[in-house]
Amino acid sequence: MVDQESLVSFSSETSQSINSDIDIESQQQPRQYIPSNEKDGNKERLHLTRTETVKSLQEMGMTQDAPIPDVNAPQTTTKNAIFPEEYTMETPTGLVPVATLQSLGRTSTAISKSRTRQIERSVSRRSQNIAASSNSSNKEELEDEEEVSSDMSNQQPELDPEIEFVTFVTGDPTNPHNWPLWIRWAYTVILSCLVICVAYGSACITGGLFTVQEQYHVGLEAAILSCSLMVIGFSLGPLIWSPVSDLYGRRLAYFISMGLYTIFNIPCALSPNLGGLLVCRFLCGVFSSSGLCLVGGSIADMFPSETRGRAIAFFAFAPYTGPIIGPLVNGFVSVCTRRMDLIFWINMAFAGVMWIIVAFIPETYAPVILKWRAAKLRKETGNPKIMTEQEAQGVSVNEMMKACLIRPLYFAVTEPVLDLTCFYVCLIYSLLYAFFFAFPVVFGELYGYKDNLIGLMFIPILIGATMALATTFYCENEYLKLVKKRKPTPEDRLFGAMIGAPFAAAALWILGATSYKHIIWVGPASSGLAFGYGMVLIYYSLNNYIIDCYVQYASSALATKVFLRSAGGAAFPLFTNQMYHKLGLQWASWLLAFISTAMILLPFGFYYYGKTLRHKLSKKDYSIDTIEGY
């Protein structure tokens, strides 16, 4: 019969076996590589002189508790990483052995701390149950003990202690964070132009919908599908390009996707029927979506978290200004030439230029850069156990599906705070596309303007968005000041949305109130100024709010946002024209104004009560509030 003392002793021993691994290594000097006379071709193998020790890692601030992975950490591997700092830290040697991490107290990738505690509690519970039950049989008790022992043995660390994880070395020129500031900002501008190119492509046809009607002899609603289907493609493309980026890098994802996008503009221009055009436009959306789903990550790759806010603010300007250029440019193209194909040739030229330019941007994704470094070191040293943690774990299709598909859907049905935030982003994005079809009714039918002059009416939106860009820098400075005073909360990110929300609602009230023939065109056109200003501020602020609320699963939360935003952007154009004709110019605008006015409460309500709502309505708190030392 197994008594209580033996099980308690068993619990203690198993607990020690998990957390043991050895404080001997921490007392040793950095491990030496034995020089080798082997030659690889005409080159002697590289002899690395040292690797990091527990002491050196502790001096760099590493502790037993693994921090939360970076926002850009790979999503194609399991989540229980023992070295999540690998992709953001620099070490003097560039190599951190698994044995050293285990000596530091890090558990293996195969077992999480929570699982360890769960097993220990299970052992303790069984001990108490056996002490309380005098009628238990010996056989049952032995089975319990064997079950726990088996559970523990199955969860032993699986990583080879001789594996050495590669990191950037101190001051590493291949680390994007160490590139000259002007280079990083130049790449930020180029990548933002890539986003503008993609967003422009979605709305390029709105400046000449009548050319689609004339070309294929279809109605306006059928012609509008050429815009909506590309936006739907935006929502599905990230399912392809996010895993490609994780596995092979952002540069390759951009090169392949933008190349396909450029090529598929050719059948758009030459399609003999509407069906062919719609299929190709959808595929253009799928291929070009890499620009929308990866550029934010590329910019984050180049800037530390403390300084990336301004660069991300600049990026937030791009997806909302790109569509505005579509009717602005192609209104003149369609009126002057009456050729639908020329609109797509221009779009192809724009995409082709960006394809070539982006091809010259070096890889920015740290996991892939380190993977290349590890391969080089394996070749030069002959040590096959130098690798990244992503390589050591291998690709997890299960985790990839969770990150790209299952978790975004799970968040959509279980996170009301995320749903409300995404709904507001979706509303603003949808209203932008609604303007593309409301302005032709207001300025075309009321004032008698042609598409070229209607396109000019979008300039105020562009001006308002530019003004908002300057305000985002102000918001970022205020946030940095706050961070120096106290620990930030996700709600601190809502300052920009609180400024922009009233402007977005006011724009629609102005549009409705000034849509009369006896009022000069400046009245309804000025609504775009307020809308552009509020639109960019709301998107910038809520995007950061989502990241801080779901920091550990930010990519999945943002995927939820992209899907809902694209769905709204695709749907609104399909009924905007009919809504303005059925309700009238005033009440159609005011209906949207009522909705936008009600949504003003969201950033203010979340600012004051967001933390309480997240705790009450969310299944789990994923925010920066739960991260110690953040």
From Swiss-Prot:
Pfam family, one: MFS_1
Membrane-traversing stretches: 190-210, 222-242, 252-272, 282-302, 312-332, 342-362, 423-443, 453-473, 494-514, 519-539, 553-575, 587-607
Protein's UniProt name: Multidrug transporter TPO3
Induction: Expression is up-regulated under spermine stress and depends on the pleiotropic drug resistance transcription factor PDR1.
Compositional bias per record (Low complexity), positions renumbered to this chain: 125-137
One biological process term in Gene Ontology: spermine transport
Compositional bias per record (Basic and acidic residues), positions renumbered to this chain: 37-46
SUPFAM superfamilies (UniProt xref): MFS general substrate transporter
Subcellular location: Cell membrane
Polar residues composition-biased segments: 1-35
Function: Cell membrane polyamine/proton antiporter, involved in the detoxification of excess polyamines in the cytoplasm. Involved in the resistance to the imidazole antifungal drugs tioconazole, miconazole, clotrimazole and ketoconazole; to the triazole fluconazole; but not to the antifungals flucytosine or amphotericin B. Plays a role in spermine homeostasis, but spermine accumulation in response to clotrimazole is independent of TPO3.
Primary gene name: TPO3
Species for this entry: Candida glabrata (strain ATCC 2001 / BCRC 20586 / JCM 3761 / NBRC 0622 / NRRL Y-65 / CBS 138) (Yeast)
